[in-house]
Curated annotation (Swiss-Prot):
Protein name: Chaperone protein DnaK
CDD domains: ASKHA_NBD_HSP70_DnaK-like
Residues the record lists as Phosphothreonine modifications: 203
Induction, as annotated: By stress conditions e.g. heat shock.
GO molecular function: ATP binding; ATP-dependent protein folding chaperone; unfolded protein binding
Domain of life from the UniProt record: Bacteria
Length: 636
């Protein structure tokens, strides 16, 4: 049986690792480095090149050299990414061409062809696969691939697609901070709580985990799929462009070759400023005008760089606050803070993390290699090479469906351990309703309209029946990859329908933060709206039952009670026309009391001419009703 490799498919760099002799080993590339640039190009001869070779020729071939493709994985043209940054705006920063394909898909152009992001990622994976096969001396067909914890379903599916295109069966998609925790904690004997702060080239994740006796349990996770080293580089690039325009009057942002040179210079300067206080950015012949060639020569200090990127570092701390809150932990309860990702080498990042958690971050792991090592360990677990390790990951957002009145009814709450399955029984909202629409939602708000739609599907063939009678069982299943499937089943007919959510547009970190902030800011308003809808549902249902009771028992109800019940029903219907929740509750209570009187009168008449019968127990009644929630589904 062949080896299963662990792959860290990064925005800036990628790595591949494998278990050998019970230990994880990072595999060097054909060029001798364990870090393989996530860069793909087609050169002037039409040859496809990947990795270090592609990066080295980027300045001479900027339009046909693609990097940071991970930021376009699972994305749609026109869809927001990050803080009000649509794909189009992100594309404008790249020297290569990004175009709109069918169904608003993102495509990138190299040579005379255009490619989807999974295709480009597959080229990187093929390079990793080839290097691993050369190192191991055998074919590699299976892999565990890491993704940011906050990757949505579409992004995870795009990653699996890339693996398939590269000829790899992806046995598991594993979250990057969780992989890092595996690498850190594999040989640890004591129980501890750790925070994994993962700031990579394009994404940011923070996870809180509990480690003990071989179990790695994620307590909470938060992050931003559009925050990373690329953004730090862009700050320097923007500054260089502005300074040069101020000094020379020339706008370098319009020159693709100059842009590529600026990107490389920015990345180099940023890395140097992690160990020195200032660096000189020297780019001869950056451009030319009528007077001749122009050069760029600027001094950048660490202090200036820190001023430029302070907002980005601060931006990473809000998810840390959210993760701590969701985990129920305080910073004092965190035993170790693990730094992951090359951007965490920046002194400012390390200082801010230290200030936030109140302790020195653990620097005992290689931030570039730890994720690939964790992926290899998970591969070893799946193949039985690593024993006594249990990994328990979570979902980042609440999942549910829309029910009566536009309410979002949660089935699986955020930070629930996966894999998991949850079922709940709902019913129809109208008499003789022949079909229902299942509206699958993602988000923390009480109202469906305030959450994100993941998908919709129909369940047809429901037999004619009064509302509330059909039993529709809705089941949510989330697999170990964090991918969701939803099934609806009519318990009466056995008819069922299901959908796998693999192409949802998902959420950026900013959207999640916005949802959370709105949920807190509008908590009182949301509660009031939800109470009103619940009160309306109870009132409408009671009035419906009262009207049915009148129709079915007209000859058994005394005239005075009949008149009183009609009056109370009318009062409820009138209250439902207005917006006074207290009036709705008051008339509902009065109708309930009147309905009880009618019931007593009807049963009293029956008992006069018949032997007493044992009344069903309260427990029996509860058992009959338990688990049924009235749901609103669209009538077709």
């Amino acid at each position: 049986m062949g080896k299963v490799v662990g792959i860290d498919l990064g925005t800036t760099n990628s790595e591949v690792a494998v278990m050998q002799g019970g230990e994880p080993v990072v595999i060097p590339s054909a060029e001798g480095s364990t870090l393989i640039p996530s860069v793909v190009a087609i050169n002037k001869n039409g040859e496809r090149i990947v990795g270090r070779q592609a990066k080295n020729q980027a300045i001479l071939n900027p339009e046909n050299t693609v990097y940071s493709i991970k930021r376009f994985m699972g994305r749609k043209w026109g869809e927001p990414a990050g803080r009000e940054l649509p794909v189009e705006a992100d594309a404008k920063r790249k020297p290569y061409k990004v175009i709109q394909g069918n169904n608003n898909e993102v495509r990138v152009v190299m040579g005379d062809k255009d490619f989807s992001p999974p295709e480009v990622s597959a080229m990187i994976l093929q390079k990793l696969k080839s290097d691993a096969e050369a190192y191991l001396g055998e074919k590699v067909t299976e892999a565990v691939i890491t993704v940011p914890a906050y990757f949505n379903d579409a992004q995870r599916q795009a990653t699996k697609d890339a693996g398939a295109i590269a000829g790899l069966k992806v046995l598991r998609i594993i979250n990057e901070p969780t992989a890092a925790a595996l690498a850190y904690g594999l040989d640890k004997k004591k129980d501890e709580t750790i925070a994994v702060y993962d700031l990579g080239g394009g994404t940011f994740d923070i996870s809180i985990l509990e480690l003990g006796e071989g179990t790695f349990q994620v307590k909470s996770t938060a992050g931003d799929t559009h925050l990373g080293g690329d953004d730090f580089d862009q700050k320097i690039i923007d500054w260089l462009i502005a300074e040069y325009k101020k000094d020379q009057g020339i706008d370098l942002s319009k020159d693709k070759t100059a842009l590529q040179r600026l990107k490389e210079a920015a990345e180099k300067a940023k890395i140097e400023l992690s160990t020195v206080q200032q660096t000189e950015i020297n780019l001869p012949f950056i451009t030319a005008d009528a007077s001749g060639p122009k050069h760029l020569n600027i001094i950048l200090t660490r202090s200036k760089l820190e001023q430029m990127v302070m907002d980005l570092v601060e931006k990473s701390l809000e998810p840390c606050r959210q993760a701590l809150k969701d985990s129920g932990k305080t910073s004092a309860e965190i035993n170790e803070v693990i730094l992951v990702g090359g951007q965490t080498r920046m002194p400012l990042v390390q200082q801010k993390v230290k200030d936030f958690f109140g302790k020195e971050p653990n620097k005992g792991v290689n931030p570039d290699e730890v994720v690939a090592i964790g992926a290899a360990i998970q591969a070893g677990v799946l193949k039985g090479e690593v024993s006594d390790v249990l990994l328990l990951d979570v979902i980042p957002l609440t999942l549910g469906i829309e029910t009566l009145g536009g309410v979002s009814t949660a089935l699986i709450t955020r930070n629930t351990t996966i894999p998991t399955s949850k079922s709940q029984v709902f019913s129809t909202a109208a008499d003789n309703q022949p079909s229902v629409e299942i509206h699958v939602l993602q988000g923390e708000r009480p109202m469906a309209a305030d959450n994100r739609t993941l998908g919709r599907f129909m369940l047809d063939g429901i037999l004619p029946a009064p509302r509330g009678v059909p039993q529709i069982e809705v089941t949510f299943d989330i697999d170990a990859n964090g991918m969701l499937s939803v099934k609806a089943k009519d318990k009466g007919t056995g008819r069922e329908q299901k959908i796998t959510i693999t192409a949802s547009s998902g959420l950026s970190k900013e959207e999640v933060e916005k949802m959370t902030r709105e949920a807190e800011a509008h908590a009182a308003e949301d509660t009031k709206r939800k109470e009103e809808i619940e009160a309306r549902n109870v009132a409408d249902n009671l009035a419906y039952n009262a009207e049915k009771t009148l129709r079915d028992n007209k000859d058994k109800i005394p005239a005075e009670l009949n008149t009183e019940l009609e009056s109370k029903i009318a009062a409820v219907r009138t209250a439902l026309q207005g917006n006074d929740v207290e009036a709705i509750k008051k008339t509902t209570q009065e109708l309930s009391t009147a309905l009880q009187s009618v019931g007593s009168a009807v049963y009293g008449k029956q008992q006069e001419g018949a032997p007493a019968q044992e009344e069903p127990s309260a427990e029996g009644k509860k058992a009959d009703d338990e688990g049924t929630v009235e749901g609103e589904f669209r009538e077709v």
